[in-house]
UniProtKB/Swiss-Prot annotation:
It comes from Francisella tularensis subsp. holarctica (strain FTNF002-00 / FTA). GO terms for cellular component: cytosol. InterPro entries: AlgH-like (IPR003774). Coiled coil: none annotated. HAMAP family: UPF0301. Pfam families: DUF179. This is UPF0301 protein FTA_1286. Belongs to the UPF0301 (AlgH) family. It comes from the Bacteria.
Length: 194
């Protein structure tokens, strides 16, 4: 039976292993309906930074704060790996290509938000991602039933946008009420050092 998980967090369980994309992934679900789901992995930083994006798109960044230039891009998923999107809190500004989500969040795929960021006009929280993850109709429901994903609606923006990527998966698990020990018990296996 279909259940809408839009604006919820997917946490990969230890059953997803040896998958370079989804092992220990934290996914924010931007869209979920009877036709499928679309989400962004938010804990897999890449070597590329916003400075690289600004240079590639010829966006002036001479006055951009250093910490913004060094901000990593995140691998949002395997689909359209060259498409950049910004997951961000709404800041009252209107961009050309913004989809408003729940909890005061939005996703924008137009250059105008990148120009604002380069000019230090920043949303309270933001995360630049390239690519996205998507599931066909019933695929996500089947994966959840197979215990590949833990779903939590306990959204915490500080954890969501935190840069402590090595512990973001564990932090989201704990915020959802799980511990590594409870996962070991739940899945009757040793998860090792998570």
């Amino acid at each position: 039976m279909y259940q809408n998980h839009k604006s919820e967090i997917l946490l990969a369980t230890p059953l997803i292993k040896d998958d370079i994309v989804f092992t220990k992934s934290v996914v924010y679900l931007c869209q979920n309906d009877r036709h499928g789901a679309m989400g962004l992995i938010i804990n897999k930083p890449l070597a590329d930074t916003l400075k690289d994006v600004f240079e590639e798109l010829h966006i002036s960044h001479t006055n951009t704060f250093k910490e913004i230039l060094e901000y990593p891009l995140y691998m949002g998923g395997p689909i359209s790996p060259h498409k950049i999107m910004i997951l961000h809190t709404t800041n009252g500004r209107n961009y050309t290509s913004t989809i408003k989500l729940d909890e005061g969040l939005a996703i924008t795929a137009s250059i105008d938000i990148l120009e604002d960021i380069a000019n230090n006009i920043l949303p309270e929280y933001f995360l630049p991602v390239v690519g996205y993850s998507c599931w066909t109709a019933n695929q996500l429901t089947d994966e959840i039933k197979s215990n590949d994903w833990i779903v939590t609606n306990k959204l915490n923006k500080k954890i969501l946008f935190n840069h402590e990527n090595k512990v973001k998966w564990q932090n989201h698990l704990e915020h959802a009420g799980y511990t590594l020990q409870s996962l070991d018990t739940l899945f009757n296996r040793n998860t090792g050092n998570c």
